[in-house]
Structure formats: C-alpha cells, structure tokens
C-alpha cells in the first residue's frame, strides 16, 4: 500500500494523505485510455512483487507516473484524477445534480425543453452541457451550459439576477448572443445557438465538437496552424470585443481557444458570464505566478497572447512563458508575442488592449472589419456598481494568492540556501518553481508544479568537544543499527491544474 500526500495550493497545511494500492493506479490508468496518450504506468508483476528492491523501484515509477499525469492540465482536471486524489470532495454525482437544477429552472419556461445531455465536452468538472430545443423553433439546435458558482462570486442573488439580465441583452458583432439564461443561489445556465463547426480549438485540432474533451485535445492526431492573415484578422476582432467589454465595465478574464467560435470568418466570444458567476480562469495556474498580472485587463491580454500562440503554431503553449519562439514566426507577430508571453514582459508589465489594437500587426487597413450589428450593452447604476465591486474583489484575491505564492517560493529558496550552501537563482518565471510547464504539457496548457517546503533543519550541534563526541557516537550507533526491513513504500507531491498536489510516501 502506498501513502500519497496531497496538497492543495501553496500552503503545506492544506494537505492530507490517501492510501492506494497498485490496482488503484491501474484503474486510474484505464480511465485515460480514451485520450490515446502514452503514459508510463509501471507493468504488473505477479512473482516477486513483495521484494523490497522491486517495491522501491515501483514507488519511483509510480511517482513519475503521477508527475506526468498532474503536469497535463486535461488529465489533471479530469474527474478520475480528482476522485483519485480527493475522494471525499469529488464523490458527488455532479451531472445528476446539474440535470436536476436545469430541469427545475426550465419548468417555468414553456418554450424550452432538454433533449439530451452532451457529456464532458468541456474542461470544467462542474460545468455540464445539454442539447435543448425551443418549442417555437424545434429545428434549431441550442446548447445549454450549467455551472456552479466559483470562488470569485461576490454578488448577492438580487445583484446576480440583475447582472445576468443585463448580460442577456448584450449585443456585439464579435460576441456570441445569448438565447436564454438564468441563475440561482447554486449556479447558472446560459443557452446559445449550437455552432456545428465547434470552437477555435476544435478548428485547430480538426476535432468533432461533441466528442469528450479528453479524447479531442489530450493527444490530437492532426493539428494545423491558421494562416498569418487569419491570425491578424481574428486577433484584431478579439481585441475589439475585449476593448468593448472593458469600456462597459465587464472584463472577460476567460479568453482561450475553447471560448471562441468562428462564423463567416468572424470570431464570436463565448462565456462572457463566467466572471459574474465567479469562475476561475483556464490560464489562472499561469498568470497567478506573475505579480505584474494583477488587473483583469492584464489577465485578458495575457490570455490573448496564449490564443495568438495557439493560432499561429497549431498547438497550445506548454509553458507559462515563451522565450524561444520559432524562427518561422513573422517578425510583427513575434514582437506582439514577446510583449505578452516572454519572461521579460511578465516581469515588467504587459501592454494594454488599446496599445495592441494600434500595433502594426493588427492595424492593417486591408482587413474587412465591417459589420452590420451595432454594439449594445446598457445597465443600471446599481448593477454597474455591483460589477465594479465584484471585479475589485476578484483582483484583490488574485493579488493575495500571488503574494502567498511568492512568499512560499521565497521560503523554499531560503531553505535551499541553508540546505545546499548556495543561493539558487531567483526568478518570477514558473520554471523556477517547477520541473515542468504550467498550464499544459504534452498537449494543452500545463499546471505549475509546486513542491512542498523542505523539511526543517536539525537543531545546531553543540560546539563543545564533549558534545561533538557524544553526538558522533550516537550517529554511528544509529547507522550501525539501521534496519532496512522497517522501511515502508512511498511516493512524493506534484500540483494539479486547480492546485491539488499528490506525492507518494
């Protein structure tokens, strides 16, 4: 039996232990088969599997297996991994509860009915999708998404209802319109027209939109970058939409290629309601490590940099920052990416949305930016103030979490100095705190690995000769009396996409 120490977030006190046998790892491994990703699970052994050397080797192999799984955000955020590492909090039948909430909400709506669920097409465990139809126009396919409130939900129910009503009336040529939406004290749902071509990520990965998220994106067989002209055009359109939202006091904070669809060569942003519901951003494990990314505008710009990278190279950025862009990257686009996702940019500060719109790469008069739909978004003074306070609290929590991570990093560095006798390089890059990437790995954005603090140093040895002889004798005695048979197998922590951390011991 292996003991796994699991840690959530940067604080060691938020940790617990679970006990797993090899067969539990096999069950977890089988849950990943739909991904098609080769994972190094150590093979089963029938004879000699109680040999101590074999157990020690298997412990190392299982730790490596856990490390690789937890570095991949798609695998790490899957329900199978959550239940493996935190069975007490993830045994709830999430999908059944979501269906109950949706059914209750639609009872008062005579025009809509649920047709069938579309399971696991998104990355959020608590977000569930259903195919619904409007009885007035039954031929139109609609997609309903239900999600529970997140940790940044700061509005009361009355303010939330007013904000939702306002968001439902929003119109913009580069933002997907909403057919119907509702919320309660548990969560909310939004109904939009179903785009059969799928998201921008589906387009890049040549994936069918209704397939499971893990199957579509963990190990895509055919990825294709977009033409540079399309990257510039779509980038400009995204920036126009972001600028509009910020001017109206509704920052996005949830930009990624899965929240963008392309219709008639025009982008449409999805899930603009996520911020009001208090949901964490897809790229939060990345930008929480950079103290210069403290405003929601900086968050949107940073996420925009990742989307640009994915469009031009055909795959997500596997690091929190990128300092080695391909030499094939066009020079103008290179300057944009370097101003957003380079280590230097994340240390010194990112450009504003307005500055990016004026960049030569996007500011090209040949782009067809004409559109017939006139932007519209109005709300009451009370709703405007409620939104402002919610964003203010969201930014405050981000700053507090960044401060906590920096303090934890500083503590680890000090312990390394004392343990190794030399100071490691200080850096704000996530690479300084992990052995791998941040919000994706072998495929999409990885999660930063956070290692627990080193064990405390032993008390100082007495400076007297007598004390030194006594302690030396005690140490030699301990070495001579050491019994290897008393050792027990173990594995050690790595952090997951939402901050959970599993280490065998």
List PLM regions with ranges.
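C-lobe/activation-segment region of protein kinase-like
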Residues: 268, 274-335
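Regulatory extensions appended to serine/threonine kinase catalytic cores
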Residues: 368-460
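Activation segment signature within eukaryotic-like protein kinase domains
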Residues: 234-235
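Short beta-strand micro-motifs within the conserved protein kinase catalytic domain, predominantly
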Residues: 177-188
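Long, intrinsically disordered low-complexity linkers enriched in proline
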Residues: 426-505
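Phox homology (PX) phosphoinositide-binding domain
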Residues: 1-153, 162
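Terminal C-lobe "cap" of eukaryotic-type protein kinase domains
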Residues: 344-370
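Catalytic-loop of the protein kinase fold
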Residues: 242-263, 269
């Amino acid at each position: 039996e292996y003991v796994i120490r699991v840690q959530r977030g940067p604080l060691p006190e938020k940790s617990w232990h679970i006990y797993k046998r090899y067969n539990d790892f096999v069950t977890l491994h089988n849950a990943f088969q739909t991904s098609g990703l080769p994972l190094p699970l150590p093979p089963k052994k029938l004879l000699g599997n109680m040999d101590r050397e074999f157990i020690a080797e298997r412990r190392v192999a299982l730790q490596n297996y856990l490390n690789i799984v937890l570095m991949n955000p798609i695998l790490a955020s899957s329900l199978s991994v959550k239940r493996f590492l935190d069975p007490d909090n993830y045994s709830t039948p999430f999908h059944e509860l979501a269906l109950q909430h949706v059914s209750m909400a639609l009872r008062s709506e005579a025009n809509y009915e649920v047709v069938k669920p579309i399971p696991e097409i998104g990355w959020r465990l608590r977000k569930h999708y259903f195919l619904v139809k409007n009885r007035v126009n039954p031929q139109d396919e609609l997609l309903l998404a239900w999600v529970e409130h997140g940790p940044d939900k700061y509005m009361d129910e009355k303010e939330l209802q007013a904000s939702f009503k306002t968001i439902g009336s929003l119109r913009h040529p580069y933002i997907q319109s909403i057919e119907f939406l509702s919320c309660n004290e548990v969560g909310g749902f939004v109904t939009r027209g179903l785009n059969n071509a799928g998201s921008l990520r589906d387009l890049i990965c040549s994936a069918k939109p209704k397939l499971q998220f893990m199957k579509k994106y963990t190990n895509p067989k055919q990825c294709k970058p977009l033409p540079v002209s399309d990257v510039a055009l779509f980038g400009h359109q995204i920036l126009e939409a972001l600028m509009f939202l910020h001017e109206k006091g509704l920052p996005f904070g949830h930009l990624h290629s899965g929240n963008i669809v392309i219709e008639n060569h025009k982008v449409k942003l999805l899930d603009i309601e996520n911020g009001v519901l208090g949901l964490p951003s897809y790229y939060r494990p990345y930008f929480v490590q950079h103290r210069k990314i403290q405003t929601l505008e900086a968050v949107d710009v940073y996420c925009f940099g990742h989307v640009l990278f994915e469009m031009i190279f055909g795959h997500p950025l596997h690091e929190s920052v990128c300092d080695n862009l391909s030499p094939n990257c066009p020079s103008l686009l290179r300057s944009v990416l370097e101003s957003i996702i380079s280590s230097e940019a994340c240390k010194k500060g990112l450009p504003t949305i307005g500055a990016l719109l004026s960049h030569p790469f996007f500011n090209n008069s040949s782009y067809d930016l004409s559109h017939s739909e006139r932007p519209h978004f109005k709300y009451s003074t009370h709703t405007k103030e409620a939104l402002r306070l919610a964003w203010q609290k969201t930014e405050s929590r981000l700053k507090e979490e960044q401060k906590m991570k920096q303090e934890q990093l500083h503590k680890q560095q000090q312990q390394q100095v004392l343990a190794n006798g030399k100071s490691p390089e200080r850096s704000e890059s996530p690479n300084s705190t992990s052995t791998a990437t941040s919000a994706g790995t072998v495929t999409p954005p990885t999660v930063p690995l956070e290692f627990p603090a080193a064990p405390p140093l032993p008390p100082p040895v007495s400076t007297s000769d007598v004390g030194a002889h006594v302690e030396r004798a005690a140490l030699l005695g301990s070495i001579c009396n050491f019994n290897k048979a008393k050792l027990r197998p173990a594995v050690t922590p790595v952090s997951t996409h939402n901050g959970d951390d599993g280490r065998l011991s």
